[in-house]
């Protein structure tokens, strides 16, 4: 998904200046923006990354999401250790929320999403924190995207991986 040197294959929905590559990682720092992986869409898939979020920062890993302006329409695996939003890292935003801090700010962690049909699992550092069935199958297919939530948040992503599931 990411070659460690450029944003080839990625496209910001707005404010592309909020995204850079530094030390082999994708860094979000600046005004709100979402960086979409445009290479392929996916329905049943795995999506994972090593992530670090600043103190007070807010971000997310979107999957099965539509490209467009503003906040994407799709599922979001939250990335948030200490932002004022009480929904913390590992939450399936607005579907199944986690309110405890699983990872301190400025600490690398791995977030792993598995989406198969209506079943969604989110793991943080290999521990399952969400095991949810969306009976409505709200979002069945779409892009992957990374979130830069707001100025003052700094998020770093590396070792990004996606894999379609049979």
What are these regions (language model features)?
Residues 1-166:
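Carbohydrate-interacting regions of secretory-pathway proteins
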